[in-house]
Amino acid sequence: MRPAWSVILLTTLIGAAQGLFLIVFALDVLRSPPRDFVVLSCGISLALLVAGLAASFFHLGHPERAWRAVAMWRTSWLSREVIVLPAFMAMVLVYAVSESRVAGAIAAVLCLALFVCTAMIYACLKFLQEWHTPLTFVNFVLLGVASGLTLAVPLAVLRYPQFAGPLALAAFGAGALAWIVRVATLIRNARLRPKSTIQSAIGIAQPKIAQKAQGFMGGSFNTREFFHGKPKPVLGAVRWLFLALIFPAPAWLQGWGGGSLEVFLAAFALQFAGLLAERWYFFAEARHPQNLYYQSMA
């Protein structure tokens, strides 16, 4: 599939925002942190949500028609995401302003629902084997929580310094778990085999069939939208890059930082760069069955 940067930014930004909010609300319930820490964290979470929502509009051919997306909520996970995302944003704002844990609990439920909606947009597609797995949902949640925790550490240094250490330790654990599950997903996807072949696509049982031409010389919507257009060495390089950046690099910085705000911010920046690479690879890795026909170009 073709990685669209608007969707990459949407999913990574709102994932970090969701993770940050869940951590802050859990702390508010369990530890009663300073109010300015909660308000600052909710403000950052809202800013990330707004940025992600703004990025998503660049993926629309007609942004003025975006409101119509809600009409298909009975059958479309995308429509459900369009409903849940602004509802979650509104409840985060209410929680930050009102100090109401009831509002926070509603926001937490909406946050989890948003994880489900976003992940299921991809996991429900049975013909894309790389996505059609519960690991898609698990990865979205774990990577979101890990990035939210990594972002919470420098915010704690600013407003809740006595808890920055435990948060850094939690970020290490969440990052390690997210990394392990993502590696498990890579191993699973590497073992997948196409359910269709060129023989089954054209209904001929001849074992040796080679495509010589596809009827036109240039590209088309299909070859642009359903293939990333990059050679295998590029995919391999991106895979190793995100595996290094989403956990080992930020974990090393957090361990070496000694409570430094600048180092913790750098750890989040590195991890977020890794998340962008991971999400690009997530889309590029998915092999659309239609490329059996367009294989001379895809």
What are these regions (language model features)?
Residues 60-68, 122-127, 192-198, 283-287:
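Juxtamembrane/interfacial segments flanking transmembrane helices
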Residues 33-91:
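Membrane helical hairpin/interfacial module
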Residues 56, 63, 85, 186, ...:
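General alpha-helical segment detector with a strong preference for membrane-spanning helices
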Residues 19, 24-29, 61-63, 154-161:
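Membrane-helix interface motif
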Residues 263-298:
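C-terminal structured interaction module
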Residues 1-51, 272, 284-285:
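N-terminal signal-anchor module of multipass membrane proteins
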Residues 5, 10-15, 31-32, 75-76, ...:
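Long, contiguous internal "core" modules enriched in hydrophobic/ aromatic residues
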